[in-house]
Amino acid sequence: MAASFCGSRRYDVFPSFSKVDVRRSFLAHLLKELDRRLINTFTDHGMERNLPIDAELLSAIAESRISIVIFSKNYASSTWCLDELVEIHTCYKELAQIVVPVFFNVHPSQVKKQTGEFGKVFGKTCKGKPENRKLRWMQALAAVANIAGYDLQNWPDEAVMIEMVADDVSKKLFKSSNDFSDIVGIEAHLEAMSSILRLKSEKARMVGISGPSGIGKTTIAKALFSKLSPQFHLRAFVTYKRTNQDDYDMKLCWIEKFLSEILGQKDLKVLDLGAVEQSLMHKKVLIILDDVDDLELLKTLVGQTGWFGFGSRIVVITQDRQLLKAHDINLIYEVAFPSAHLALEIFCQSAFGKIYPPSDFRELSVEFAYLAGNLPLDLRVLGLAMKGKHREEWIEMLPRLRNDLDGKFKKTLRNYLPVIRKRVSNEEGGREKLKKGNKKLDLDEEFPGGEIYSDEIPSPTSNWKDTDDFDSGDIIPIIADKSTTIIPNRRHSNDDWCSFCEFLRNRIPPLNPFKCSANDVIDFLRTRQVLGSTEALVDRLIFSSEAFGIKPEENPFRSQAVTSYLKAARDMTREKECILVFSCHDNLDVDETSFIEAISKELHKQGFIPLTYNLLGRENLDEEMLYGSRVGIMILSSSYVSSRQSLDHLVAVMEHWKTTDLVIIPIYFKVRLSDICGLKGRFEAAFLQLHMSLQEDRVQKWKAAMSEIVSIGGHEWTKGSQFILAEEVVRNASLRLYLKSSKNLLGILALLNHSQSTDVEIMGIWGIAGIGKTSIAREIFELHAPHYDFCYFLQDFHLMCQMKRPRQLREDFISKLFGEEKGLGASDVKPSFMRDWFHKKTILLVLDDVSNARDAEAVIGGFGWFSHGHRIILTSRSKQVLVQCKVKKPYEIQKLSDFESFRLCKQYLDGENPVISELISCSSGIPLALKLLVSSVSKQYITNMKDHLQSLRKDPPTQIQEAFRRSFDGLDENEKNIFLDLACFFRGQSKDYAVLLLDACGFFTYMGICELIDESLISLVDNKIEMPIPFQDMGRIIVHEEDEDPCERSRLWDSKDIVDVLTNNSGTEAIEGIFLDASDLTCELSPTVFGKMYNLRLLKFYCSTSGNQCKLTLPHGLDTLPDELSLLHWENYPLVYLPQKFNPVNLVELNMPYSNMEKLWEGKKNLEKLKNIKLSHSRELTDILMLSEALNLEHIDLEGCTSLIDVSMSIPCCGKLVSLNMKDCSRLRSLPSMVDLTTLKLLNLSGCSEFEDIQDFAPNLEEIYLAGTSIRELPLSIRNLTELVTLDLENCERLQEMPSLPVEIIRRT
């Protein structure tokens, strides 16, 4: 049996440093922080550092994932350090090692250019040294100093920077691999494995993963390993394959390799089979053994959990469940086959790169996924086989798949599946569609159910089979027609809703008939307001889909998701929220009657509709009434047990509660919880009387229902004011309704359900400024304050800390706690005293708007003294602050949806209003912004509203400015600059793109973006930067405030300002970025237009509208461009060269489509940082020889460069190239050998009609497009392309022969 090991390198981190400067101070603290994060760091154990660098140290550098280079004053005095640096630089270039430079009391520019004190020290070291050695040192110093790192001069103290360095290293080491981000369903598997592994337990644990081949066991294990690795200092992922050798020496060999991998020790020798236990008994390890098929191997390597230290986890993966049992592994995760819906997503991910198919492939995808079966590997194989193929090819393949899978694919599947299921179905070829036109469709006349009330709607699908109104495929075309106006169910409609339907009609796209999912249709039904007949329509769709051959159990319209959509649709039609009040009306006493009246009156007062639900006098549960409400108030009294009927209904209500999102608020009216739980007091006698003649199982259901409702918690009343209780109950109901509509606030809902919790709870609420955190915290406080011995609500904590300082706030807090008469000061009260004093008292404490965890701890004396019955609620704009305050799970308040924003708008604006859509967009779902904007706009005349709204964006209300400023002012300079760049230039752009460009500008962009997310200033949606419009406006206002004159501002985006600066030649060194939308603009620029913009980092001239050309002319040429540019994007660049004086040393992206350039410039330039070059459709371009200097180039786009003939001298030099697009380069004839381009994944030569010859393919190509070329034969190296998934040879009419390809490549392509 042979083993292939796929664990990590020997060391996580290699530190390079001068021991004279940092060993006993900075380095010692850094190593401690790294060790605390379980990061394996190389230590030289006092190795003498004035000798020549030896082989062991070179090996340690090469086998480390990250090198931290600590530049200090005397770093360059050591040839040892400088030789180390050369090796690190080599590993950075050749092995993609991560390098983190740290500048300890030395400026980066001094290191980079060897100037100042650092340069003097370096000069002394260089004396008498060979020139080639000095040159290597200088190159390494310049290159490494140019990498984004940490400069101590930019940090308040060493401790803060050390913590940040350690955090950054940890993130770089342990970030989850992108390899698993697009694996469909992986999160559910990881969650299931986490519950089996019980990571919080200190006991070592051995578990198994079992399932057939192809089910995804290894993928799950690799994702699990990636996720858990940060928690274990020692870890290994090992894959085994069977071999015939199985003797004692082989077992020793297994152990040697196994321990070498885990311990990071080379050439380790073991003498006996007990070495695993002896080496790992006291170590916490993570071990994953993949593809195990030999019990002896398990006994040898992981004999029992006692061999490993506390907290260790061992995961064994096998197809043989009995092998796990034989090794006493009883905790086994059996990987299940995916559901039909999940199988479709797996197939689509492979076929289209996303979990849903394009609209014109929907029906085909459903059938292909069905025919592939439910084994993930088969689904992926078939998906990859169809990837990139045209729809006609799919249709052509379909008959073969239905009858018998084509031979090669079937042969592949047989390796994984014993039986290939066949599906024979007769598909109806066509669907007769309704003629569409601009007409008003009244469902009363043309569709049964338009005005049918809910209790009249036919539910069984069989009821539709005899209707002659429409053919089975007619429903979707009707609702898809955007010109159709649908009359909603008038029972539920009102003027507000009708106006919203018109508002939506202009915002939502039309629905494409027959090419939509169940969710698409239901979404469309909801937004187009076919709500009165939604259930009927869905029934019709269920029946219609049978015509497509979809089985009832596989029908997406029967899914729970559709049910929830229908309920959401019903929710949206309500004018007011309905709240149920459960009671036994026939047995009420005077107090209960009075209380129900008080509840009803208070509900009306707060805008709710009370629905009284009598549990007596009903044969069956009224489901319509239950589904019509989201909250039910249950009044529990002794009258409940006076009737079997009421108890049966209680059981039914609780069953409904368990399966829906109904919230129950119990009121224990003149009864005690202990009486209900233990059936004591008045409950006991009444229950015994009912019990005597009944079956035991019915009685047990009653008891279970009563236990469940008691577990919820609630309100008790024995005597006192019923009106006060009614107010408290209704406030509770109102808050719960709000929290239920707010995503991720389920924990706060749980908080309300367990008001008498005995454990200390520290809850946290976070979200962007103006989202409503304070309002929610205040509601919770007022609701629960009566139940606590001591309550304290400190609003505007951040502002109060600025005004009074934390010490004074602590004095106020102590005074509130103990009372001023006790005369205790902050210095008198220690945490231990607090713990003892409040040991048997309950405390409710709210700190609102916390911005600093240390301030919070200083005011309340830390969080350690709180104990049972104490509850702390914190609100903050920063999630990280809450985590630092020991909040286990912070709850985020989501922004308002468009619908919720619309409802809020209608509270202030009457009738139709032309700016509602703009108000919703401009507020970005922030309640504070929306209220203030709507309030201001509502005071204007209709004709002035739009202009007034635009002026508000340039000068927002004071409250919006103050809310934003507080967050912005708390950022450091790095984060402020990043935020302003994002606000001015990168909103809606890819995060990776922003990081690439801004890192080149000297910012720590990744860390900055993380901090901005934590501060709720931005968010990521599909890896794109999203920023609320009010925050973007405020960011731009800050830039405007820099100076009245645009030429003195750092960032320019307004076309009028930019044109003024450019045409007047008034640019200055203050300008760092220009993004000009030149659509419909025409202007002439001076040759010296950029002459004084020394600090310009980002330059983009573009056209946002198709068909327009960027008409910025340079009639007298262009003298130069700023050397600081990291982005140069200029569409339709008018000159034949870039300025010869331009030094692109900092250039990361050169994007100049449709330019007039013949070549970039004469001679060689420093292009070390250049990553992307896009010169597409530059029809005069003939020479790209200068790209040979761009050694780090990753993406080349030369599409449509029709004058380009030869690239043989430039492309082979781009050793890090990932994609090469030369589509439609019609004069290109050949390409040189690309065997050295090991990173190249995509090659596109489609449309290169004269292209004839390619010598060799890059070895790791995944996509090759040669359609329409004149190629005669393919290189034999195509047989070795193990990663190839797409090979396009369409219309290659001169292709004479094709090398025979391995079956694996044919299967993938």
Curated annotation (Swiss-Prot):
Top-rank EC class of the record's enzyme: hydrolase
E.C. code: 3.2.2.6
Domain of life: Eukaryota
Residue numbers annotated as active site: 84
Catalytic reaction(s) noted: NAD(+) + H2O = ADP-D-ribose + nicotinamide + H(+)
Coiled coil: 1114-1141
LRR repeats: 1145-1167, 1168-1195, 1214-1237, 1238-1258, 1259-1283, 1285-1307
SMART domains reported in the protein's UniProt record: AAA (SM00382), TIR (SM00255)
SUPFAM superfamilies xrefs: L domain-like (SSF52058), P-loop containing nucleoside triphosphate hydrolases (SSF52540), Toll/Interleukin receptor TIR domain (SSF52200), Winged helix' DNA-binding domain (SSF46785)
Domain notes: The TIR domain mediates NAD(+) hydrolase (NADase) activity. Self-association of TIR domains is required for NADase activity.
GO biological process, one term: signal transduction
Family membership noted in the UniProt record: Belongs to the disease resistance TIR-NB-LRR family.
Described purpose of this protein according to its UniProt entry: Disease resistance protein that cooperates with RPP2B to confer resistance to Hyaloperonospora parasitica isolate Cala2.
Gene Ontology molecular function terms on file: ADP binding; ATP binding; ATP hydrolysis activity; NAD+ nucleosidase activity, cyclic ADP-ribose generating
Residue ranges constituting the TIR domain according to the UniProt record: 9-173, 574-737
InterPro entries xrefs: AAA+_ATPase, ALOG_dom, Disease_R_plants, Leu-rich_rpt_3, LRR_dom_sf, NB-ARC, P-loop_NTPase, TIR_dom
Domain (ALOG): residue spans on this chain: 488-585
Keyword Kinase (UniProt): no
Keyword terms: ATP-binding, Coiled coil, Hydrolase, Leucine-rich repeat, NAD, Nucleotide-binding, Plant defense, Repeat
NB-ARC domain: residues covered: 187-418, 755-987
Pfam families hit by this protein: ALOG_dom, LRR_3, NB-ARC, TIR, WHD_ROQ1
Protein name as it appears in the record: Disease resistance protein RPP2A
